[in-house]
Amino acid sequence: MNTSVIRYLLGYILKLEGFLLLPPCIVAGIYYEKSGIYFLIVALISIAIGFIFSAKKPRDFTFYLKEGCATTALGWIVLSIFGCLPFYISGEIPSFTDALFETISGFTTTGASILPEVESLSYCMNFWRCFTHWIGGMGVLVFLLAIIPLSGGSNINLMRAESPGPSVGKLVPKMRHTARLLYIIYFGLTTMEIIFLLFGKMPLYDAICTSLGTAGTGGFGIKNDSFCSYNVYLQWVVTIFMILFGVNFNAYYLLLFGHIRDALKVEEVRYYFGIIIASVVVISVNIAHMCTGVFDAVTKAAFQVGSIITTTGFSSTDFDRWPELSKTLLVLLMFIGACAGSTGGGIKVSRIVIAVKTIRKELNGYIHPKSVKKLTFEHKPVDHDVIRSINVYFMTYAVIFIVSLLLVSVENYDFTTNFTAVAATFNNIGPGLSLVGPTCNFGFFNNFSKYVLMFDMLAGRLELFPLLILFHPSIWKELFIQADKKVKGNRKEKQNVRM
């Protein structure tokens, strides 16, 4: 295992985080808040440690998928630990576990909060909560790919370890240019949302924080009632942009370069919009008696469907009071999730579509045994390795979900609370139902349950396997053995120099 490049990249992640901790200092300066000093302290510490880690440049930057997964998992853990320190040392979130939970929830774009009073936080702390969504939405390692030159194979292995979905492709020949292009699209859409929100007379601070949360499909709000207090125009703007950020970014690349017909032919996106439209129609009819009219019903249904399927987690109403059909459909959307290659979480539409097509193909095999029709997706045959990887993903997903549900159930809360708490964190949604509904929070869970849910958030964001690799004994053996060899080698070199 190439431990030197893992160390080097972790150093860059810490340096990058140090600079990302500076914008909250600016916010603190604007609002004359003393809390900005804590961000500055953590930023300096993070940058200093980052320089130590990345001081010695590796001779060989080549590494394989296992190094990519290990770097990704360790990077996100380190990112979260340093990211939670401003909350903790400032005393605004006095418990380290709670501060870490809030930060992991932010970076993984989950949006599950332990805070009963969001508005009691300082402006800079609330900005940091929302900014973590934006950082984690596209992925910090994708950003690193845009600024650090690695060999082509290393680039794709690093991106595969962090990017959501069953496969990762290049938009342009060089992966470094792909990463840059993704961030250009990401930044452009975020800026557009801010502008549209300002047109609706939303305050600039609110517009920026809301857009950062929407872009990362995160869901941290700056109001205790999430989005309930905003007008209908603002709700529709956020609804549209939540759905847009749940689209596969490959489609935006095609649109950007004028390939409109090809963009409209993207199969996953067509299924994605089909699911949204069908869900909005069903829920609108189901909640019509609770609304003031058809438009009100469609507005509320569209907002919540867009929020849940994209795993954003904003709420414009207390959907925990909706009829059982609507709540069941929303829970189902939690599992489906957004498109692969988007900032959304969940299982992903592409996996669901391929799984359904696989079942249909097997059924056709029973009816027509001699049929040799191949399974296709996005107008291309699906390789057997892709089908196998999706099957393994579903099995691993089910095992982690069941084990997490059992562990959280030890506290003896009702089944709906436990089930939707795991579903909401594992799929990076945010709110669930019952005690973790849209008007509630996760603060009542004990520390053990919170760490289980933190694991779920990280596992869900990293597509399970990069995090699970850290629990494989051989990984730690390779890391420690190689580190020990390097220490002994350095000692021998020093002894030879003295002689």
For each predicted feature, which ranges?
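Membrane-proximal intracellular helices of multi-pass ion channels
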Residues: 1-499
